[in-house]
């Protein structure tokens, strides 16, 4: 599993399993990005609050590096799935129109709501000329899986939410669903080797956290081991 290092840090010394998590408030092109590292762009809703003008100005600045972008985090509301869906509908099209892949942030309660799709299931069936026997469960689930793959409205699933929700069974199922569709899965706030290992085993592709901001030397050492030799770590040593 890849680790996305905070933008402000120097990552020249880190191995290839590290990318960059960039922030609009830094207002500079990260050194790691200039060196060719892959990166993601945060919306800062969790830390500073989303600032549309600053956010889109930053996207414009990073447009020449679009081919290195893993995802742009669409604005979200912490621990509120319904509000996050509204924000996604408002802001995702504007980000996609600029040629960037987008990440939908999973928040508490999403299991009771519909995920963002470009077309609803009934319309998709009509457009594809498919008629499903209501008694044929296998045909129904096969068609639904194809519809999800064709119509999912985002490129990456960002695991947010409260800590309790993030570690719960609903989130694990969403990760499995996303991987079946071939989506990138990123986990926020990963600050221990135990949690790194947990989400790696679930199939997540990348993660980030705050520990490098407070103890960069220790974080670089421990995370380099976790990224390079992840199967060796099962415990909860802080990282």
Describe the residue ranges of each PLM region.
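Acidic (Asp/Glu)-rich catalytic clusters
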Residues: 11-15, 26-40, 55-69, 89-98, ...
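Non-catalytic, usually N-terminal nucleic-acid engagement modules in DNA/RNA processing proteins
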Residues: 1-91, 228-230, 235-237
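Glycine-rich adenosine-cofactor-binding loop
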Residues: 106-108, 128-131, 139, 151-196
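Catalytic cores of alpha/beta
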Residues: 53-57, 112-124, 184-185, 191-206
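Active-site-adjacent beta->alpha loops and helix N-cap segments on the catalytic face
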Residues: 24-34, 50-53, 79-93, 110-117, ...
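Conserved, mostly hydrophobic/aromatic
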Residues: 42, 104, 199
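Glycine-rich phosphate-binding active-site loops on the catalytic face of alpha/beta enzymes
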Residues: 161-163, 191, 195-230
